[in-house]
Amino acid sequence: IPGFKPWTSEDGKVDITVEHLLTHSSGIDPYLNVKSFVEKYGENQPDSLVRYISDNAGRNFRPGTKFMYSCLNFIALQAILEKVTGERLCDYAMENVFRPLGLNHTGYLPVGENPVIDLKYCAPTELQHEGAPLCGQVHDPLARRINGGNSGNAGVFSDAMGLSVICAAIMNGGTANGVSILSPSAIDLMTRVPEDIDGGVGRALGWDHHSTHSGPRGDLFDRESTICHTGYTGPSIVIDMKNRIALIILTHRVHPQDKGSLARFRAVIANIIASSMMTSSCGKPGI
């Protein structure tokens, strides 16, 4: 990535690539202190945030050798996409993914210009200092306060129907509702661990494959053919590419306070779905 500070050590330097960002193997700091950043630069400062990630954020290990989830990775990817396309991420996603697929309740910025999502469909999240919960605003403070809701790490609002169409596109070689959003080769690349990334990383391009974050998959879905991802507030998606099954859980753990855990819940639901699939295909209980 031109102009991006590399990893340096006594053995020399290693450049960070787009693949490292997508697989969370870049070694870049997981997050930043939002309060300190806002005090220094102010709110709604996406350009300052990108410069911080490029020049100042810590590089913690040699890229491609370990997994460490980082919101900064996907904000860097957002900056690259916006530079290449000349569009904001929220607009590009709407014009090239959400609207072509007919997703009428999916998008960024329900509270903002030209909202496409009615606030009555937005679940409230954490109570704020003034006593009211966030509703229709992305929960993640970095995405909300520094990126203004248009952010690569968080901020898409959707419903189960909309997400099911996206899952169908992924399972069908990039096509759903008669519209192609990605090529079959792109889907193949994004659903497996890259060959040049250490196997212990366990991440596909944008998706979890078998890393330490693959708990939502449970114990029964096939490791080699299943990808998954979670959202910080609680939602999760599991996609079994081989058996063409998608599990979408839309619930959250941060209302009224950020104290809940859904780790066990997700795994149990995944096991129930996977075992029922085995029962229907084999004619006998799967567990």
Predicted regions and their residues:
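Acidic helix-start/capping segments at beta-turn-to-alpha-helix junctions
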Residues: 1-5
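Structured C-terminal helix/loop/strand segments within mature extracytoplasmic catalytic/sensor domains
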Residues: 229-287
